[in-house]
Structure formats: structure tokens, C-alpha cells
A protein has these predicted regions:
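Bacterial N-terminal signal peptides that target proteins for export
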Residues: 1-6
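Short, linear, compositionally biased motifs with a strong N-terminal bias
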Residues: 11-12
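N-terminal signal peptide c-region/cleavage motif recognized by signal peptidases
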Residues: 15-18
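Low-complexity, acidic/polar, glycine-enriched regions of mature
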Residues: 20-192
Length: 192
């Protein structure tokens, strides 16, 4: 009897693994913030975040695969200083009127059972370049308020403004143009 029960349980486990599916998480714009930081003539560091972000993360834990598709509104950049915000939105920098979005699409890479990086492409100022984001932390919980699964992560990568054709790139040539991009995300499991 015990042997039969174990066989049935093993069969159920194999069946559930065989039919594992991808789960889509819709990013919560109130808890998702890409941020950038870069040198200001080498004497200090400017830090800003983007307030309007949307997108999805798809994960298949059994297959250890996943994808990310994120869109950021370029005119939502906020450095905490109106003059810098306007400069960043102008045609010297993001040129948000002409290029209203920053886009990132990538594939999630697993190490063991954990997602550890995203290998993808970022499009800024109409220029697309490869960008790998290292996942610093990630966790999923049954959210106490939403009563459904919510996942969050913190990731970062490096890019260089000089590669994206911005007029201000001349001030950030070489190492001076290096920028740290970080993104904190939270997403709710999409109902099927």
C-alpha cells in the first residue's frame, strides 16, 4: 500500500514537472524604479530615477528560463533638481520629445535554481546596445495585502553615455561617461 502511494505521488510530481508552465508577472509601477548614477565632471556623482515604468517578467522555474520586457518613460527622469531634470529631458541628453521611451529586453540566466543575471539589449536615444544586468537579490512571496504571489528583484549593470549618441556625451567621453543603471522591480502574478 505504501509502495503504491509513493508511486502515485512520484507520478504526480513527474506530471507536474512535465507540465510546468511559464508564469507572467506584471510590473507594479508604484514599486518599480530604474535609477542612474554617473560622474559630474569627476567631482561628484549625479543620481536620478525614473518614475514611470511598465513591463513584464516571464519565468519558467522548471525549465530555468525567463524573459524581461521593460519600458521606461524618458521624461519621467527625476534628479531632485528641476534644472537637471529639464537638461536630461532635452535634446542634449535623452531627447525625450523625439525618443520618449527607454526599452530593455533580455533573457534571464539561472545558476542552479536562482535567477542570477539578465542578458539583453537596451535602447536609449534611438540606439540599441547589449546590456547585462546582474541580479543582486530576488524573492517571491504570497503578498499579505494583494493575496497573490508578488516577486521582487534588484539588479544592476553598467553602460556608457558616449555609446548612445547624446550631445552631452562629449563631457562623458571614455571612463567619464560610465553610468551605473540599477532597477528595483516588483511584479504581481498575472491571473490566467
Amino acid at each position: 500500500m505504501l509502495k503504491r502511494a509513493l508511486c502515485v505521488m512520484a507520478g504526480l510530481c513527474l506530471t507536474s514537472t512535465a507540465f510546468a508552465e511559464s508564469i507572467t508577472y506584471v510590473l507594479d509601477p508604484l514599486h518599480t524604479y530604474p535609477s542612474i548614477e554617473f560622474p559630474h565632471f569627476g567631482i561628484s556623482v549625479w543620481r536620478g530615477k525614473f518614475d514611470k515604468t511598465s513591463g513584464t517578467v516571464v519565468i519558467d522555474r522548471a525549465a530555468k528560463t525567463g524573459s524581461v520586457d521593460i519600458t521606461v518613460q524618458a521624461d519621467s527622469v527625476d534628479f531632485g533638481l528641476d534644472a537637471m531634470d529639464e537638461k536630461a529631458k532635452s535634446d542634449d541628453f535623452f531627447d525625450a520629445a523625439k525618443y520618449p521611451t527607454v526599452k530593455y529586453k533580455g533573457k534571464i540566466q539561472f545558476v542552479g535554481d536562482e535567477p542570477k543575471s539578465i542578458v539583453g539589449d537596451i535602447t536609449v536615444h534611438g540606439v540599441t546596445k547589449p546590456l547585462t544586468l546582474d541580479i543582486l537579490s530576488s524573492k517571491c512571496i504570497e503578498h499579505p495585502f494583494y493575496k497573490k504571489e508578488v516577486c521582487g528583484a534588484d539588479a544592476q549593470g553598467a553602460l556608457n553615455w558616449a555609446e548612445f549618441g547624446m550631445k552631452m556625451s562629449s563631457f562623458g567621453a571614455g571612463d567619464a561617461g560610465k553610468t551605473l543603471l540599477r532597477i528595483q522591480v516588483e511584479g504581481s502574478r498575472k491571473e490566467s
